[in-house]
């Protein structure tokens, strides 16, 4: 374990829960953070120090992670990013911000309800404008029971594939027949797949992702310029390049091609668990079933790497998207995102967004890609 001076301390125990914690150290020392990350079986790479490095490399955030130690030596880490140029009582912090995936508390064996409640209490006492917490869906029960009454909760639904039993079990018992058939169809049609961990394939992924945003804008009755402006602000190419650079081999970029033309791509973060972080496809080539083949290969690789779960992200209220994920054996997990704020900023933001949507006659679309 790690003392608050940032050095490994032998002989300390990780497995004794308590609701007594020391004052937080921020930013969290990286060696302690890495130890806690690897000892939490539900951890995702979006909770890693490398992920924070990637977010900070974009120039939009600063590391505001927090390290706690219990009276019995158990370490807890809360990854946290602070929006640049917001400080003190005007600070805007999140674990993690929108567009940056799952955050939330890390602990050896996973956080307990008592630990979540204690950290919530510590956060609530800080003079910070807003603190947004997007926890791991696998820890939903601890967060639901530990959240205070003044934490605003937003219901979410995530889909995860349980990889226990290995790929043969997942393929034969969890993948539906239509998905297995789709993967074989893609191979017969000549779809080829490449996986890279150097960032070399980011440009191909990003072109497909940008095309998908343009397509979504038409389906959702949103002006294309508005959708693309938001896309380049929230998901610039430099963001994905930073992720690939900072995570290295833990960031896989998969690209499916037909006659050398990229037709589908996804970014998978691989650690204790696999995280299907982003995916996009060329809608003109859906008949090739490239997504089915990509998912077969990515899930197989996650099983081979020893991942316990394959996280397919949130599904929102889209029945179509949920059904797509369930074809590959994913199951829904209900959980909540939490917000601590000193002023009703979220209420104002939500009202403005709804007003814009009404003005452009925006309609939700259940989309894949």
Regions found by a protein language model. Name each.
Residues 112-158:
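Non-catalytic accessory segments adjacent to catalytic cores
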Residues 82-102:
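Conserved acyl-donor/pantetheine-binding loop and adjacent beta-alpha core of acyl/acetyltransferases
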Residues 11-14, 21-73, 78-88, 138-155, ...:
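A conserved beta-strand-loop-helix scaffold within acyl/acetyltransferase catalytic domains
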Residues 66-67, 108, 117-121, 237-350:
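Aromatic (often tryptophan-rich) hydrophobic motifs at membrane interfaces
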Residues 96-106, 153-160:
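Acyl/amide activation-and-transfer machinery of modular secondary-metabolite enzymes
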Residues 2-15, 81-82, 145-169, 304-369:
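Active-site/acyl-donor-binding loops of N-acyltransferases
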Residues 132, 194-195, 308-313:
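Short catalytic-loop micro-motif centered on adjacent basic/acidic residues
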Residues 41, 127, 209-217, 302, ...:
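A generic secondary-structure signal for well-formed alpha-helical elements
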């Amino acid at each position: 374990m790690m003392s608050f001076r940032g050095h490994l301390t032998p002989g300390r125990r990780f497995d004794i829960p308590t609701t007594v914690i020391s004052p937080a150290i921020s930013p969290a020392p990286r060696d302690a953070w890495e130890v806690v990350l690897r000892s939490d079986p539900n951890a995702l790479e979006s909770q890693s120090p490398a992920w924070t490095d990637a977010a900070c490399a974009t120039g939009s955030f600063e590391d505001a992670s927090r390290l706690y130690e219990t009276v019995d030596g158990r370490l807890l880490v809360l990854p946290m990013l602070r929006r640049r140029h917001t400080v003190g009582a005007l600070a805007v912090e999140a674990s993690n911000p929108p567009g940056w995936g799952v955050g939330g508390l890390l602990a050896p064996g996973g956080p307990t309800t008592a630990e979540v409640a204690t950290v919530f209490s510590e956060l609530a006492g800080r003079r910070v404008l807003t603190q947004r917490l997007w926890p791991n869906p696998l820890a939903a029960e601890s967060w639901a029971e530990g959240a205070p009454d003044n934490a605003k909760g937003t219901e979410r639904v995530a889909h995860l594939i349980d990889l226990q039993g290995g790929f043969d079990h997942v393929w034969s018992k969890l993948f539906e027949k239509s998905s297995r058939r789709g993967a074989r169809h893609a191979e017969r049609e000549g779809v080829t797949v490449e996986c890279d961990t150097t960032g070399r394939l980011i440009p191909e992924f990003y072109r497909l992702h940008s095309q998908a945003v343009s397509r979504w804008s038409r389906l959702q009755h949103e002006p294309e310029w508005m959708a693309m402006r938001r896309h380049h602000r929230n998901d610039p190419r430099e963001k994905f390049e930073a992720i690939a650079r900072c995570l290295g081999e833990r960031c896989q970029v998969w690209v499916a091609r037909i006659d050398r033309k990229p037709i589908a791509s996804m970014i998978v973060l691989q650690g204790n668990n696999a995280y299907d972080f982003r995916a996009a496809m060329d809608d003109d080539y859906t008949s090739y079933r490239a997504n089915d083949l990509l998912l077969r290969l990515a899930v197989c690789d996650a099983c081979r790497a020893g991942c316990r779960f394959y996280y397919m992200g949130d599904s929102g209220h889209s029945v179509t998207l949920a059904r797509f994920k369930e074809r590959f054996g994913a199951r829904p997990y209900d959980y909540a995102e939490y917000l601590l704020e000193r002023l009703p900023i979220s209420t104002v933001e939500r009202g403005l967004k709804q007003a814009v949507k009404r003005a452009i006659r925006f309609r939700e679309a259940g989309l894949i890609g």
